[in-house]
Amino acid sequence: MQTTYLSMGSNIGDRQYYLHEAIRLLGKHPKIMIEKVSNFYESSPVGGVKQDDFTNLALKVATLLEPLELLDFIHEVELSLNRERKIHWGPRTIDIDIIFYGNSEIQEENLIVPHKEAFNRLFVLKPIFELLSNDFKYYEPIREAIAKLSESEQELHVIEEEKSPKNRIEEAVKEILFAVGENPNREGLLETPARVAKMYEEILSSQRLTNFNEYKLFEIDSSKNDSIVLIKDIPFYSMCEHHMLPFFGKAHVAYIPDGGRIIGLSKIPRLVNYVSRKLSVQENITHDIADILTDILKPKGVAVLVEGRHMCVEMRGVKKVNSLTKTSYFLGEFKENGEKRMEFLESLL
């Protein structure tokens, strides 16, 4: 296995969450073993782009992946954590760089090792230096560079590592169990906090996502643009943001293509999943489906109708079992043309 040093940084949203998630995802690969993690640091941004401070750390990993294979997997991890490459040296949810790959010197079109900017970046070298033994090939050059950069205007200081979201949820669930009169240490509840944390990771998986990108567009004969494309009875499950109780039901989604652009049929259910897997209300889910579909497809019109049962209505309060809430939202021709709107509604009967 090859010893490799990675530098990681984040300056958007919950920075430590993205760093923890990146470490977790890297460690799940069967050919990567996380050996050491540095302290967490806060650093001022470089590169001249106005943005928030970064949280940085370094990893020492052992890997069986070749350098370009490792780079490809790193890009997959970054993409899964909502990394967008819009501004060079700009803000990002996560940035992972290969700094050293053993003692190798690599000159590829998309990979240079040692990283070409490493010896100019205090936030790269200082965390990595924590992880090195003094027989490492670049130990002395790194030590000398740190001494020089420490006299520059680059700001860097150690910060406290925060608890992971999983640990926070587990501790909160234990407190809730105490508060309702339970004993979280009794046999039936010992693993409940961990189960709840894992459940929230699944059912609120869109909570930190800002863009829907699980789709592909296709072209068809533009003469068929007036035909309505409808997918109905799409199941969804979500969590009410008012009481954190489930609500669930079916979504019916239609659009009228424009310019021959259509979206893969399976992507509309994926869109419904995306908007529903976070704390929300039914009205927002209805609008979000229509707005996102309009943004990515630019159709002539979009129609969405959502039917839902709400546990905050059925389990508590008024306790009206089996009551059904319907919400609808129309854009473009569905909003302006009553015949098109009626065609959509009649197709649901």
From Swiss-Prot:
Establish whether keyword ATP-binding is in the entry: yes
The annotated region (GTP cyclohydrolase 1) lies at 226-349
Q: Which reaction does it catalyse?
A: 6-hydroxymethyl-7,8-dihydropterin + ATP = (7,8-dihydropterin-6-yl)methyl diphosphate + AMP + H(+); GTP + H2O = 7,8-dihydroneopterin 3'-triphosphate + formate + H(+)
Q: What is its EC number?
A: 2.7.6.3, 3.5.4.16
For this protein, the record's InterPro entries field holds:
GTP-CH-I_C/QueF (IPR043133), GTP-CH-I_N (IPR043134), GTP_CycHdrlase_I (IPR001474), GTP_CycHdrlase_I_CS (IPR018234), GTP_CycHdrlase_I_dom (IPR020602), Hppk (IPR000550), Hppk_sf (IPR035907)
Q: Which GO terms describe its biological process?
A: folic acid biosynthetic process; one-carbon metabolic process; tetrahydrobiopterin biosynthetic process; tetrahydrofolate biosynthetic process
A single GO molecular-function term is: 2-amino-4-hydroxy-6-hydroxymethyldihydropteridine diphosphokinase activity
Gene Ontology CC: one annotated term: cytoplasm
Q: Which HAMAP family match?
A: FolE
The protein's name: Bifunctional protein FolKE
Q: Report the source organism.
A: Lactococcus lactis subsp. cremoris (strain MG1363)
> What high-level taxonomic lineage is stated for the organism?
Bacteria, Bacillati, Bacillota, Bacilli, Lactobacillales
Instruction: Give me the gene this protein comes from.
Output: folKE
